[in-house]
Amino acid sequence: MGPTSVPLVKAHRSSVSDYVNYDIIVRHYNYTGKLNISADKENSIKLTSVVFILICCFIILENIFVLLTIWKTKKFHRPMYYFIGNLALSDLLAGVAYTANLLLSGATTYKLTPAQWFLREGSMFVALSASVFSLLAIAIERYITMLKMKLHNGSNNFRLFLLISACWVISLILGGLPIMGWNCISALSSCSTVLPLYHKHYILFCTTVFTLLLLSIVILYCRIYSLVRTRSRRLTFRKNISKASRSSEKSLALLKTVIIVLSVFIACWAPLFILLLLDVGCKVKTCDILFRAEYFLVLAVLNSGTNPIIYTLTNKEMRRAFIRIMSCCKCPSGDSAGKFKRPIIAGMEFSRSKSDNSSHPQKDEGDNPETIMSSGNVNSSS
């Protein structure tokens, strides 16, 4: 027993010491070929970094305004808007994390310990993972809300807490796996070229997870659209012409929103997914495209800038509130003004707009399912 226990202790100590060994960064970057690339093109990286940092600043400010809009507008203190707020928070952190990543890149990379390097890259994985999981949480909430509006209404505060908590817990675990041991510090031949301290198996695992998330989001939004179309056909069958035509308009608006959501998501993330798959399959120093990974990553980060536009600014009332925040106009009675400007007849609130952009759901239970998501609007039944 004695002789076998000594090597185990030594192995543990050496692995811990590796996390504070500055030479490991240089060794891994030299093995993958990124050491020479970064030395040869240091000036161009600085120029592109400035552009990328400006993009990140825009993303940060954009999402701060979204959070302020939700916080200062009482009518947005509902579960669905909390999901949008969580998405804005994760997108904001993605912008902050990528800015820090850029500032700590280049020559600064070789002054980092492996532990600091894992924190630099892990923070990006956590923020981007939280953003993607937030998109999935919004899709789940919209789908469940539609089903509950057909069956029965109940409190969804627990579901709100559960989904948001799961979003961050899973993201933290996913981003923390390399620093917890799933890395290639002691296995150079298994190292990623894009991220030289990450194991290729970890890269493949993350790519698989994100691909499954994308498929889940696609399936959920297709199911939402299918439910709306089913409702529209049912109204047509009952010869309820006014409701059927209104439902048909909402279905078309919903279809456009679904196409926008999925197209933007795929356009931003698919190139990075493909690059990471190439990283897993290519042998070291054989795929030159892997040395241009920053352009693929910034495209994924751009999704954090498009999310506020898709999920909030297409909502008419959120757009108005957003403009009020930007113009620094304090409207204490702004939340209740909309209620008194519309006549209330027989317990029903009528919107002045004939479009589906209003986020006030009609009291008619038959119309509720279609108002869940139309033209970017999101409403909760809570």
UniProtKB/Swiss-Prot annotation:
Post-translational changes noted in the entry: S1P-induced endothelial cell migration requires the PKB/AKT1-mediated phosphorylation of the third intracellular loop at the Thr-236 residue.
Taxonomic classification: Eukaryota, Metazoa, Chordata, Craniata, Vertebrata
Ranges facing Extracellular side: 1-46, 105-116, 183-196, 279-289
Alphabetized Pfam families for the sequence: 7tm_1 (PF00001)
UniProt GO BP: actin cytoskeleton organization; adenylate cyclase-activating G protein-coupled receptor signaling pathway; adenylate cyclase-inhibiting G protein-coupled receptor signaling pathway; angiogenesis; blood vessel maturation; brain development; cardiac muscle tissue growth involved in heart morphogenesis; cell adhesion
PANTHER family per UniProt: G-PROTEIN COUPLED RECEPTOR
Predominant location category: membrane
Tissue expression from the record: Endothelial cells, and to a lesser extent, in vascular smooth muscle cells, fibroblasts, melanocytes, and cells of epithelioid origin.
Effect annotated for changing residue 180 to Y: Strongly reduced interaction with CD69
Protein name: Sphingosine 1-phosphate receptor 1
Entry-annotated residues carrying N6-acetyllysine: 10
Listed Polar residues bias regions: 371-382
Induction of the gene: By the tumor promoter phorbol 12-myristate 13-acetate (PMA) in the presence of cycloheximide.
Glycosylation sites: 30, 36
Family (UniProt): Belongs to the G-protein coupled receptor 1 family.
Residues carrying Phosphothreonine: 236
GO cellular component terms listed in the entry, alphabetical order: cytoplasm; endosome; external side of plasma membrane; intracellular membrane-bounded organelle; membrane raft; nucleoplasm; plasma membrane; presynapse
Modified residues (Phosphoserine): 351, 353
Membrane protein topology class: Multi-pass membrane protein
Keyword Glycoprotein carried by entry: yes
Protein's organism: Homo sapiens (Human)
TM region positions: 47-68, 83-104, 117-138, 161-182, 197-224, 258-278, 290-310
Record region (Disordered): 350-382
General function of this protein: G-protein coupled receptor for the bioactive lysosphingolipid sphingosine 1-phosphate (S1P) that seems to be coupled to the G(i) subclass of heteromeric G proteins. Signaling leads to the activation of RAC1, SRC, PTK2/FAK1 and MAP kinases. Plays an important role in cell migration, probably via its role in the reorganization of the actin cytoskeleton and the formation of lamellipodia in response to stimuli that increase the activity of the sphingosine kinase SPHK1. Required for normal chemotaxis toward sphingosine 1-phosphate.
Binding-site list for sphing-4-enine 1-phosphate: 120-121, 265-269
Entry keyword set: Acetylation, Angiogenesis, Cell membrane, Chemotaxis, Disulfide bond, Endosome, G-protein coupled receptor, Glycoprotein, Lipoprotein, Membrane, Palmitate, Phosphoprotein, Receptor, Transducer, Transmembrane, Transmembrane helix
Biased composition (Basic and acidic residues): 351-366
